Amino acid sequence: MKSSEIRNAFIKYFEKNGHKVVPSSSLIPENDPTLLFANAGMNQFKNTFLGLEKRDYSRAVTAQKCVRAGGKHNDLENVGFTARHHTFFEMVGNFSFGDYFKKDAIHFAWEFLTKELAIPKEKLYVTVHISDDEAADIWHNQEGVPRERIFRFDKDNFWKMGDTGPCGPCTEIFYDHGPKAGTISDPFKGIEAGEDRFVEIWNLVFMQYFENPPGTLTPLPKPSVDTGGGLERMSAAMQGVFNNYDTDLFQPMIQLACKIGNIEYISDKEVLAKNPAAAEVTSALRVLADHCRSTSFLIADGALPSNEGRGYVLRRIMRRAIRYGRKLSADKSFLPGMAEALIESMGSVYPELKTRRDHILNTIRDEEDRFIATLDKGTAILEDELKKAKSKGIKELSGEVVFRMYDTYGFPADLTRVIANEQGIEVNEAAFEKEMEDNRAKSKASWKGKSMGADEAHMIKFAKDYLQSGKSVTFLGYEGTIGDGKVMGLSNGQAEVQELKTGDTGLMILNATTFYGEGGGQSGDVGYIMHDTNRARVINTTKIDDIVLHHVEIEHGSFKVGTAVVTGVDPVERRNTAANHSATHLLHAALRKVLGTHVTQAGSLVDSQKTRFDFTHNKPVSSEEIKKIEDLVNEQIARCNPVQTEMMSHKAALEKGAMALFGEKYASDVRVLTMGDFSCELCGGTHVKNTSEIRLFKIVSEAGVSSGVRRIEAITADNALQYMMSAVTHLDDALAAAGFQKSPHYIKHLETTGETATLANRVESLKDQVKQLEKEMKKLQGGQVNVDDLAANALTFKTKAGASAKLVLADVPLDDRQVLAEVTDHLKNKIQSGIVVVVGQGDGSHPIIVSVSKEISGETKAGDLLKEVAGVMGGKGGGRPDFAQGAAPNRAQLNEAFSKVKSMLGL
């Protein structure tokens, strides 16, 4: 039975039994930054099980895409070496939200397996929790399962959503693959040991309790059911194979890989046990097939390889696959072709694979090209380090080496670990982590000098003590730039003090402030803190937890702990920063609309001068796309939408559709910032009151910062206006230089002046003219050299084989390498067989070209001759046996160099 038939049969069976067919959710969880990837069928129903969301149905059935490759559920390192571990798998499941419970859930599962799939009952075993007599009785009395085929376990048969929340016993169904699949014949022991013969194919969770506090179980008024079965495992059972990789879900990809690499896939366990080389090939093919699935589906759902969060996990999966591909063949590419096979076989079930086909394949090829260069170079360097360690009898690779591989060569630490372990060498994990931590500290300290220095460590303790004492700090900056506060703590940068005087620099903590502390990508405010005639200039503002640190220079008077003060943020700096920050939110929304929903924020920096926004995208943003993005943002600015902020629970914010960043920690109550129906994000920064205050938005640069991450820099308000005014001035100058008359009607003039009607066309036309003139000039330069005379004066020498050949030594007063190369070719054609050495005349460095006829390049190499000539003249160069080029500064030694060539040829 095909896997597609099993999937369809499952859906239809439960639909027939009153279940709502719910499509698979994306692998990228929507509005749940706590979850790395969708890893179970119940993920999309989480709020329903928690009682936070009501649906218009109480029964559901799904075939859910799942990835387990990071966090709590991480199967990555097992993939390829066991029969049933995968990074990507499909979980088919049925769910009851306060509807049916144990009796129906058990009946549905047993009926589907034994009647719809016609699995022999003697091939199945079930497990229940040690306390769940009810489930055991249902299995025996209702479904007729013999008591001896029902086993009881403890923790393995009790499921929890977390430390607190819904939980309950579960019952699992195991399939017996027979004695050939494993060595343990006793089913209880085999199941307990997780042996390959007895494989779990379905788990039924009975959510009948609520745990809170931990250890205290309260019965739920409406128990629910959450079930999940692995399609891969069901397929193996129905297709009569022991290993999931031998099913039709993997074999099309594996067979294609065998064809690409001209290799053989062997699945027989006994054969593999006796043939380590074949076992290595089989494991590599299984890794490739599995990782191709997770890679393709993750990219289709919006993930991109990067160095953080979900993107980093995807990159690890892809690079692990690429490395195993290199083990199979040094010059063959496997992943793109295998991805095409996957799209062909599963695209009808998951149409996103087909609609995003080009994006998937381009992303895979790009990451493969990048990593192979890193892999080849890094592997060679790592092998040298491992050889050194072995020669000294060292069994551990130092953390410094692992960090250097990562930091200098871009070689992933986990890959270093794998390669080292394969050769029996461990990695000093603690030392590596220390190197990483030291590097992070250095990076923080170097960022514009704004980070906390070591001499401020005492303030961290003070800030935390202040918070723990129950005192609060009020931020007044959302209401305005001026406010009242009291000095609560002072530091001179070395220790706490009671007073700062004129000329002192240090840190100041207030109980209330209008100054925004650097955070969330927004720079800290600047301005003044005053009392009476005393004035402190705030040069930067940072934050520890919720305590704002004002970095101050006392310009006049003194400040003491307990002094009442007035805070005044620089209004121009605040206004410009707010415009840039609000524009960043509009930019984020516009990017997702123009480029796709795979775009997510990967970093940002907002200050009064510009906004810098990093985002996930695997190719440059085209000029047409940039224009669309700018138009969308400026359209929202022109609409004069009010910028609304609202405090609400984190859950309510996500339900409202607010964008949340994966990996970001949020408080229970969050600030939601909305601009019309265009943008809705969680944000604690300062913003404009109305989009019209942004005035104008202009992108000034777009570039890549790492694989899969692009960066846009943009300006707003006065900066954008000045930029545009300058651009118009330059345009006017360019128009005049191109022959257009300056006038208010020049645009109309451009439209009616013939084939060079636009400035761009005129510039392109001029560029073509310049290229043609350069070509003609080079032709004239080449014509200045009398090739016939040089060929006629060629010297004759004998090759090692005794044949006659010609030698031309030419001193040519030209510096264009292309022209010199053409002269060299003409000379070689004239003499037919021999050697041509041409030295040009440049400004400080003189080009040298050596060309040798192919029939004698085996005994006399162009590169060797070039090194001698260039060496005499104080230069260097290199090339192929038949052609080489270089340069040298000392033309005075030209005759000596030519004499050297003659002597080498016996002249």
Swiss-Prot record:
Coiled-coil positions are: none
Q: Which GO terms describe its molecular function?
A: alanine-tRNA ligase activity; aminoacyl-tRNA deacylase activity; ATP binding; tRNA binding; zinc ion binding
Q: Which cofactor does it need?
A: Zn(2+)
Gene3D superfamilies to which the protein is assigned, alphabetical: 2.40.30.130, 3.10.310.40, 3.30.54.20, Bira Bifunctional Protein, Domain 2, Threonyl-trna Synthetase, Chain A, domain 2
Entry-linked PANTHER family: ALANINE--TRNA LIGASE, CYTOPLASMIC, ALANYL-TRNA SYNTHETASE
Entry's family note: Belongs to the class-II aminoacyl-tRNA synthetase family.
- Name the record gives this protein: Alanine--tRNA ligase
